[in-house]
């Protein structure tokens, strides 16, 4: 036989606040109509304008490679807007290797806007670059607007 349950005791103290993983984030853009030559094999896109980086994401001097200090799953999105429609592709490179989910393949019909949004697991110290490829020639990004942008937010 079981006795009746006794009264509920007082609430315990509140536990410590958990980590805010989304505090690891970055946004960078090219807004001044940059023009650059693209190689078929790929060229990193410089994002020197409108940079908002948390302290644990840094950028190199060329503004085209971002290093993440914290390992985790990241939501990444990018946009590339060219003045002229082109048959180029875009992708995210991590430590020199293409992230397959990020790839927007070169198309037979020219496009002036390429974008993608995906999740990727990054190791601490990973070097991340936005790259265009599959086209050999000059690319001019939209001026006075978002010619290209990259956003990364750590989710876990």
Label every model-predicted segment.
Residues 4-156:
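Extracellular jelly-roll beta-sandwich "head" domains, especially the C-terminal globular C1q domain
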């Amino acid at each position: 036989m079981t006795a009746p349950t006794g009264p509920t005791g007082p609430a315990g103290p509140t536990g410590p606040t958990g980590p805010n993983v989304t505090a690891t984030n970055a946004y960078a853009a090219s807004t001044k109509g940059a023009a650059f030559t693209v190689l078929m094999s790929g060229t990193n896109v410089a994002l020197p304008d409108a940079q908002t980086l948390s302290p644990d994401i840094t950028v190199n001097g060329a503004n085209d490679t971002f290093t993440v200090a914290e390992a985790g799953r990241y939501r990444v999105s990018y946009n590339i807007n060219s003045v002229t429609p082109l048959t180029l592709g875009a992708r995210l490179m991590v430590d020199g290797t293409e992230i397959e989910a990020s790839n927007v393949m070169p198309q037979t019909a020219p496009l002036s806007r390429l974008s993608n949004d995906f999740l990727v697991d990054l190791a601490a110290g990973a070097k991340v670059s936005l790259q265009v490829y599959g086209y050999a020639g000059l690319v001019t990004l939209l001026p006075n607007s978002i010619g290209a942008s990259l956003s990364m937010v750590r989710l876990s």
